Amino acid sequence: MSAGTKASELRELGNEELLAKLREAKEELFNLRFQAATGQLENHGRLKAVRKDIARIYTLMRERELGIETVESA
């Protein structure tokens, strides 16, 4: 993911792609936390950006679950 994924970009993705993005973001967050703990992290703002990306993905998934947002078929 880039410096921060926009919600509009995430809305264009299907459910499977969203789950893949979520897995990637969680893995990146784990790696960033590990780097921070060992003193190797240079960009601390990236932690915040990845956490927000994860929150955006969870929000979008919940909207779809409740029927607020529908999956657009391409």
UniProtKB/Swiss-Prot annotation:
Keywords: Ribonucleoprotein, Ribosomal protein. Pfam families: Ribosomal_L29. One of its GO terms (biological process) is translation. Transmembrane segments: none annotated. InterPro entries: Ribosomal_protein_uL29, Ribosomal_uL29, Ribosomal_uL29_CS, Ribosomal_uL29_sf. GO terms for cellular component: cytosolic large ribosomal subunit. GO terms for molecular function: structural constituent of ribosome. Belongs to the universal ribosomal protein uL29 family. HAMAP family: Ribosomal_uL29. This is Large ribosomal subunit protein uL29. It comes from Streptomyces coelicolor (strain ATCC BAA-471 / A3(2) / M145). The gene is rpmC.
